[in-house]
Amino acid sequence: MKMNSPRRIRNNRAKWLLGFFLTVMVILIGRLAYVQIFDHARYVALAKNEVEKNEELYSPRGTIYDRNGNQLAISVMVKSLYCDPATLNKQKNINKIEMAEILSPILNISEEELLKKFSQEGRFVWIKRLMEPEEALKVEELLKSKDWERFLGFREESKRYYPNGRLLANVIGFVGVDDKALDGLELYLGDILKRSKEANSVRMRIDAKGNPIMESALTPYKSKGENSVYLTIDQTIQFYAERALDRAMTKTKAQGGIIIVMDPKTGEILALGNRPTYDPNHFEKAVEKDFKNKAITDIYEPGSTFKPIIAAAALDAGTYSTETVWHDPGKIWASGHAIRNWDDGAYGDVKLVDIIKYSINTGFAHIGLLTGGKTLTEYALKFGFGKPTGIELPGEGAGILFNPDDMRDIDVATMSIGQSIAVTPLQMLQAYSSLANGGQMVKPHILRTVNNPDGSVNKVYETEYVGNPVSKKVADEVKDMMEKEVSEGGGINARVPGYHMGGKTGTAQKIDPVKGGYLENEYIASFCGFGPTEDPRAICLVVLDNPRGVYYGGQVAAPVFKETMGQIMRYMGIPAMEEKRISSAGAGVYNNDNLPALPGKDQKAFLLPNFYGWSIREVGEWLYKAGLGFQPDGNGSADSQSPGAGETVQRGDNIRVHFSDS
């Protein structure tokens, strides 16, 4: 066999190696050509990602408007101050301590904190975000005069601004740094008001440690625009409501207060105010309790404002009628416990209108026991109690109802006078919409429309009916009796001259959240009503938490209703009705049907009715039968009195009434 020579073997090996290297070179050249020609853009982008990163600038959120287009929350561009510590620390002629001393009073940041920021590693650190214009202007002048522009600079950021300050603050909420919504509608509407985070990004170069380099902000992506939201709130009505609430807070020194106004036909919330409150432009100065929207989150015992619901339930269930006469003995027993009237008095023979008008506890306990706990609970659920209304706000409470299987007679009796249950203020408003609206109940809502960036309407929030708890006949009957409560009964201080109003006062002891039971000498005073009763256009609920001194709802909450509703009637352009007087001309016969029921024989203290328009004979006869003294002044019809209507008097007190022919 022929053997290969050593030279031949070496030549073959050399050829093989040469071929191998040529093949590798062809592959490498081909790959390089592919990268340079066909995949160039991808590798450039990858390279840029090693030295650049996305940085969120948080461009403007959408605007929140009231129903009439008034701005409630807007975004404005403001300056934020940053520093390049690496460049600063290379400056031999810059005294950082002196810089801190100069900037500290302007920025309201301690010198120690500033020096700490100046000494950080890297090329970028925030000094102060979202500066006030005056601050930025002063610092800008310093940068130029002190030649600090090499290491200090500004970046524009979006800041939320609330033009009306405290107005509607607990509802709107607020936005913190980094565009983070922290409460209220701002939180609830986050995804609607800010459609895309990418639209608000910028590219920044970074150093070896990943820190952004301060001068490297590149062109931001063009914002696609944001949605805007229109609320059902009317800014003018909101102002009226909050002003009346503030006056009551000052006068009564209450710990807190709530006022809500709603259209009973549509469920649109026209005003919603809370006290305490805060300025969302300076939310950092507030404390935790100031942020709370108690109108939807907190529960309370409604007291006598719940009694019209009980009356409606009994009438609709057929367990009681408007013509039923019941004799009030002043005390009624349930499960071994006595239920008494607020004044410890007895009212004698009374009909349902009297039981409502004079808020007779024994009467409602009697009605509740006749109707039964299971039936009352079923109606309470129909009226929307025990579950959230579903309004477009975060943190809504559900309230508390009895399990009817566990109810004793005392539970039924106390529920019938608005105790031993817990409701939210918004639930009360929703329930009253049924009584004001012919039995039809509407769901409260606060959003009206969501609009696209071009202004076109994206979504409309329609009126939503949530059942008919009672018939139209029953709702109208209760509404008429609630009008008597305002015109003649304990709600006299809610009367709006020229308009017929219906409503109910409420006074309830505060629940002890720690020990259970009730807090001593602490009360919730409230009034809930609507008007004008012929065609209700607004429901208004007023709640005062622990007013000092006088604490009855008819004396401290009803006047807030009166002031607010009076202004609303005029603002809405609803014409006032001519005042109806009881004519004294030729009225030689005393007509008991026209006059409020007399207090019971055993009743020592009671509310004085409104004598406006009564004749001297009518006033004198009523006062005589009530056991009160009479001091008339003038002739004609009564036009003023002392003590005033709705004030508490005792048998034997003298009542001065002035009469005139005008």
List the model feature ranges, each with a label.
Residues 3, 8-42:
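Hydrophobic alpha-helical transmembrane signal-anchor segments
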Residues 11, 73, 207-220, 259-304, ...:
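Beta-lactam-recognizing serine transpeptidase/beta-lactamase-like catalytic domain environment
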Residues 51-53, 82-92, 100-104, 121-130, ...:
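Second-shell loop/turn segments in exported
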Residues 55, 59-108:
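Juxtamembrane extramembrane loops of integral membrane proteins
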Residues 56-60, 253-256, 444, 632, ...:
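Short, small/polar residue-rich loop motifs at catalytic or cofactor-binding pockets
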Residues 98-105, 117-226, 542:
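Small/polar-residue-rich segments within soluble enzyme cores
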Residues 213-257:
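Conserved, well-ordered alpha-helix/loop/beta-strand core segments that scaffold catalytic motifs
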Residues 498, 542-553, 558-662:
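Ligand-recognition elements built from short beta-strands and adjacent flexible loops
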